[in-house]
Amino acid sequence: VSVEDEGDGVLAATVQGLDGHSFENTYVTNGGEPVSMALVGRKVLTYAEGLAPADITGKFTFTVTGEDGAPMPERTEVTNAKDGSVDFGMIKFTLDDFNRKWATEHPEDTGLEALADGEAAARSGKPRTVSFTYTITESGEVPGVTNDQNASRTVTFTVTDDGSGALTVTRDPAEGASFT
């Protein structure tokens, strides 16, 4: 590389002798592996003391939808188990998922070079955070059981790229079942 001072406050750099060789820098997180978190919930029946609850095994169907571009769990429709548990499986968040969301939410970010295929160049050393929101909808009926009037719940997963190669995910709510 040859650098010349043009005398106008601008330095001009010229590359010489590449002969078909080039350098390509690649930014990956977690060794290229996604970061995962389970989307689980629970169907809860409340009943007066002394009453036996109805058997609800498989009686309620839960469907998950994600906002545009959100990675989806292993299953998008499930029924509840005998204990009321609901398990959609793992959601795998990749750096590509993260970068597509970031580029959509931050088009003004000149430090991010959005590419046509949805990938984006990383901003080394600067933490970035995006959120993916999912809606879980319940359907089903059991004689003697009054369903909750609010048949939908939302769950938000926050994914952070620390800018140094680590991608992490947290969930809101953070503790217990994702939804009840």
Where are these regions (language model features)?
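Solvent-exposed loop/turn and edge beta-strand elements of beta-rich ligand-binding domains
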Residues: 1-180
